[in-house]
């Protein structure tokens, strides 16, 4: 194996955020109706009381282990997922399940659980460390590579990254030449998967920044070849600059949302879409060498996005499915809230967010996530696969929601 690039997680230059500072998954559905499931909701009746730092850390271990065990136990019987997405959810190398593994592997860096580690390793071996190749350029289908390469980092097994490297070499030799505007919808091979538009040959939608860039970065790290992250870094910033709103400090899901308004006349910034991007930045920074020339640029983007998100938490501790229009969907939405809580907690733990307000918001967010977990470990209030702020029921649950809470737990377990 090539010389490993050093992975450094360091305390980063502190720029405090004032209390008043400003601070959307991959899918097919879009619903413009307002959820009416708001009359004295149960989630408002059982809010957790304030916890000590020790209790927060303990709760992170308890919650993460419970939800990880529950989720793994459901594989092969995902009856609770709508039939329209059940078969895809059962595919370990499709983005839905891959998003769970991103959270799980981050948790396994905190909690050294040999049974869960063996599960991840055996799943990966059973797939021969393969990517889905029906959509060779599609970011969603590169997400599982993060888990394969993580196994190389943990075990030294070079076989785990070889198929990803082979495919990424092909992409570098056949770079897509399309713009980032979401235009024509095209069918893919068997019809089991889809493109929303030809621009998805690149990373033209918010979700993509969570799914793919870190895979390319990790590949550079384990091979010692910078060409993979050079490509990913360039593509990340092309998309980030295109979708980020300087006015709001938030990300549009894709170009179709630039001028879109909700029923209440507000701009449409999808909670989970922003969660995908916001969570991607700490994940990238954790793996990015300290001296990399793009490092400060990622940190500055993180600060801008965090400043906006800190202002948008609901009184119950969640982030709205429609960030600028909390009346669009008034119930909790845990996947976006989990990703955002993770990102903010990471900023506090790494000395970027230094004010008490940020810490209080993170603790409130964690308590809200904790309240959304069933006694059996099921993660409730998770918006199903989509691309817009859609209604959510308590019984709605999906693998990426579990992954988001695991990410949050990985930071709350270090809380000070």
Regions found by a protein language model. Give the residues of each.
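C-terminal motif of bacterial Sec signal peptides marking the signal peptidase cleavage site
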Residues: 23-25
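Extended ligand-binding clefts on enzyme/binding-domain cores
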Residues: 206-209, 214-323, 330-341, 353-382, ...
């Amino acid at each position: 194996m090539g010389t490993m690039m050093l992975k450094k997680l360091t305390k980063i230059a502190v720029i405090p955020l004032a209390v008043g500072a400003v601070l959307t998954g991959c899918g097919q559905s879009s619903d413009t109706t307002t959820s009416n499931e708001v009359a004295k909701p149960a989630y408002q009746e059982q809010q957790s009381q304030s916890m000590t730092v020790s209790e927060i850390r303990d709760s992170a271990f308890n919650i993460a282990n419970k939800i990880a065990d529950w989720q793994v136990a459901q594989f092969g019987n995902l009856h609770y997922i709508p039939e329209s997405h059940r078969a895809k959810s059962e595919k370990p190398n499709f983005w839905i399940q891959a998003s769970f593994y991103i959270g799980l592997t981050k948790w396994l860096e905190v909690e050294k659980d040999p049974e869960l580690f063996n599960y991840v390793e055996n799943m990966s071996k059973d797939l021969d460390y393969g990517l889905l190749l029906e959509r060779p350029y599609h970011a969603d289908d590169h997400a599982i590579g993060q888990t394969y390469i993580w196994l190389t980092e943990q075990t030294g097994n070079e076989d785990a990254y070889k198929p990803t490297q082979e495919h990424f070499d092909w992409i570098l030799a056949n770079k897509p030449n399309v713009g980032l505007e979401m235009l024509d919808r095209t069918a893919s091979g068997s019809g089991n998967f889809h493109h929303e538009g030809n621009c998805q040959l690149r990373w033209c939608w918010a979700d993509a920044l969570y799914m793919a860039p870190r895979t390319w970065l990790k590949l550079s790290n384990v091979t010692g070849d910078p060409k993979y992250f050079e490509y990913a870094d360039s593509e990340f910033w092309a998309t980030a600059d295109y979708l980020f709103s300087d006015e709001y400090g938030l990300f549009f899901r894709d170009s179709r949302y630039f001028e879109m308004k909700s029923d209440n006349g507000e701009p449409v910034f999808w909670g989970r879409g922003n969660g995908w991007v916001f969570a991607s930045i700490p994940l990238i920074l954790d793996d990015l060498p300290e001296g990399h020339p793009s490092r400060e640029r990622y940190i500055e983007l993180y600060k801008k996005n965090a400043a906006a998100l800190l202002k948008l938490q609901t009184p119950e501790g969640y982030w709205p499915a429609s960030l600028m229009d909390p009346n669009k969907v008034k119930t909790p939405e845990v996947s976006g809230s989990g990703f955002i809580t993770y990102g903010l907690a990471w900023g506090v733990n790494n000395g970027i967010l230094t004010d008490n307000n940020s810490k209080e918001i993170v603790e409130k967010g964690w308590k809200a996530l904790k309240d959304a977990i069933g006694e059996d470990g099921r993660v409730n209030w998770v918006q199903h696969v989509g691309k817009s702020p859609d209604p959510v029921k308590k019984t709605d649950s999906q693998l990426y929601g579990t992954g988001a809470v695991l990410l949050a737990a990985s930071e709350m377990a270090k809380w000070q």
